[in-house]
From Swiss-Prot:
Catalytic activity, reaction form: Endonucleolytic cleavage at a junction such as a reciprocal single-stranded crossover between two homologous DNA duplexes (Holliday junction)
InterPro entries in the record: RNaseH-like_sf, RNaseH_sf, X-over_junc_endoDNase_Mg_BS, X-over_junc_endoDNase_RuvC
Binding site for Mg(2+) 2: 67
The name this protein goes by in its record: Crossover junction endodeoxyribonuclease RuvC
Lineage summary: Bacteria, Pseudomonadati, Pseudomonadota, Alphaproteobacteria, Sphingomonadales
Cofactor requirements of the protein: Mg(2+)
Keyword Cell inner membrane: no
EC number, as in UniProt: 3.1.21.10
Source domain of life: Bacteria
Keywords: Cytoplasm, DNA damage, DNA recombination, DNA repair, DNA-binding, Endonuclease, Hydrolase, Magnesium, Metal-binding, Nuclease
Record-annotated membrane-spanning stretches: none
C-alpha cells in the first residue's frame, strides 16, 4: 500500500510517499510544494492544488495522512494555514484517497516515542526508519513522519 503523508502550509506544503508491505516500510518519494508569497491568495491555492494533484496522479497512493492544524496567536497565520489545509483535504478527496488526520504530538510519539520531541529528533529517526533517504526539507520530513505514523496506526 502506498501512503501519502502531508504537512500543509500556504508557503511550503511538505509531502512524502511510503510503501507499506507487511511490517516493512520503504521510501518512494518526497518533496515540498512552495508558493510565491507575493502572489494573490487564490493563485497560491491554485498552485498548491495543481501540484498536489500531480503528486497524486504520478504515484497513485491508496490513502493520505494529514497533520492536523494548530491554532497560534496570529489569527492571520491560522487562517492561511486553514486555507491550505482545505485545499489539501479537497485534493485528496478529489483524488479518491481516504484521509486520516493526526495531531503533531501523536506523530512525534509514533516516530520518536515522545510527543514533545524536537524537529531534529524526528528527522534523525527518519534516517533510521528510512535509511538512505534524501529528504527535500523540514516540511517533507514532517510529511514522511505523518505517513509513517499512519502506517503504524493502521496496523493496530
Amino acid at each position: 500500500m502506498i501512503i501519502l503523508g502531508l504537512d500543509p502550509s500556504l508557503s511550503c506544503t511538505g509531502w512524502g510517499l511510503i510503501r507499506v508491505e507487511g511490517s516493512r516500510i520503504s521510501h518512494i518519494a518526497n518533496g515540498q510544494i512552495k508558493t510565491d508569497a507575493k502572489a494573490a491568495l487564490p493563485d497560491r491555492l491554485v498552485h498548491l492544488d495543481t501540484a498536489l494533484a500531480a503528486v497524486i496522479a504520478d504515484h497513485a497512493p491508496k490513502c493520505a495522512a494529514v497533520e492536523e492544524v494548530f491554532v497560534n496567536d496570529n489569527p492571520q497565520s491560522t487562517l492561511k494555514l486553514a486555507h491550505a489545509r482545505g485545499v489539501v483535504l479537497l485534493g485528496c478527496a478529489r483524488g479518491g484517497l481516504t484521509v486520516t488526520q493526526y495531531a503533531p504530538r501523536l506523530v512525534k510519539k509514533a516516530i520518536v516515542g515522545t510527543g514533545g520531541a524536537a524537529k531534529g529528533q524526528v528527522q534523525a529517526m527518519l534516517g533510521v526508519l528510512l535509511p538512505g533517504t534524501k529528504v527535500a526539507g523540514p516540511d517533507a520530513a514532517d510529511a514522511l513522519a505523518v505517513a509513517i505514523c499512519h502506517a503504524n496506526h493502521r496496523r493496530r
